[in-house]
Amino acid sequence: MSTSHGYRASWWTYILHQVPHTNFQFEVVDNQFAPQEWSYQQALLFLASIAGLCLAISLVLICVYLIKFCCCASQEDDDSKSHRVCCVTWSCVAAVIICCAGIGIGFYGNSETNDGVYQVTYSLMNANHTLTSINLLVSDTVELLSSVVKSDLTQLEEIFSTRTEFVVMIRNTRRQVESVAQQLTEISSFFWKGAELNPSALAEQVNFIEDYRWLAYILLLLLDLIICLFTLLSLAKQIKWLVIVMTVVSFFVLLLSWGSMGLEMATAVGLSDFCSDPDAYVMNQTQMITNINPDILQYYISCNQDVTNPFRQRLTMSQRALSNIHSQLHGLEREAVPQFPTAERNVLVVQGMLNTTEGNFHHLVALLNCRGLHKDYVDALKGLCYDGMEGILFLLLFSFLSALSFTAAVCSLPRAWKRFRNRDLDYDDMDEDDPFNPQESKRFVQWQSSI
């Protein structure tokens, strides 16, 4: 399980993580998240194929039911036929109601998944802003130090050329300034060693994929809702051609529902494998792609007292160098400037550089502290493994209810269609309890108009 401060894998993540992972040879494979390995990919595909098996079972049931309906319909007596007509109508209505409930669950799940992915992209952009700020702050400070070394310190050395003790102080100041610049450059190079670390590019890719995923599910949900409404309309108005169209469309949506269920099942299990221990995978992949020092990754991922700050030594050396520069400038201002008035401007420039560098240094120390980047990391995990996982599970439930509903609809609508064939000739065959009985509807309208 993850040891990141502020994140703990949820109970549904733990349950899904315990699902057996089996490859195509029916061999149990490791459930550690490893999407680049073929054996792990087989395990997820095997889980997705369960939905394909359910699709095959539903198709067999539909075929058996329709064959029985075609072969045995003529053998039914009037009482049995009337009873079955009412059952068929109510079964269609029940299937539509269940499908509408599933659609509501699907809208909620799609929104939760989108919120989780948005949290991931937002955290990645925050982390990218922090890293970019570190890089810009270091580069600006190093550039400022270099300009002072090349101009003002060189001029001071020329001004104090007749006084050896002042020249020594200037050269010591130069070495301290160069030491600070070197330490800051090394700190910055830790984040951009090898390939550039660019969380914003990852955030853009994730956001691009999420936009299309969200839109696809919205279209699927709206399609299901439209089918439910037109199915109710066809039953209420007893429109034969509309019932036929809804039967055909329901069959194709049935295929989509089982297919989306397989995709969601594999995604949920794969995400649970990642969320059960995200630190190891994130460290391995980040180090492999960017070649960052493992100690730095461990520092920001864990962010606890057991992990030492890898920048502490260089920050301490830089702080000491800045203190030495401050002392030497104070000595020059007290002893050298009264004797060399022309050096006052250069000393003040170096003093201003020192003040700016100290401000940048304190800002850099705050940015390098693990709390900021670790918070972004934990927020991304919470968005993906809490909201994202919950949304996928609700989408999985939606697909399952939708598949069951459309299976029932495909079985029931043909019988309802046959029932409409002779409705103008004989209304006596209709059950009085039928909610879509035309005579009952007509009597209800007449009763309403008489009030």
Swiss-Prot record:
Glycans are attached at residues 128, 284, 355. It catalyses: chloride(in) = chloride(out); L-glutamate(out) = L-glutamate(in). InterPro entries: Tweety. Residues 1-43, 108-214, 262-390 are extracellular. The keyword Cell membrane applies. Disulfide bonds join 275-385, 303-370. Its main location: membrane. The record marks 163 as: Essential for the formation of the channel-pore. It is found in: Cell membrane. Keywords: Cell membrane, Chloride, Chloride channel, Disulfide bond, Glycoprotein, Ion channel, Ion transport, Membrane, Transmembrane, Transmembrane helix, Transport. Residues 65-86, 236-240, 412-451 are cytoplasmic. The chain crosses the membrane at residues 44-64, 87-107, 215-235, 241-261, 391-411. May act as a calcium-independent, swelling-dependent volume-regulated anion channel (VRAC-swell) which plays a pivotal role in the process of regulatory volume decrease (RVD) in the brain through the efflux of anions like chloride and organic osmolytes like glutamate. Belongs to the tweety family. This is Protein tweety homolog 1-B. The gene is ttyh1-b.
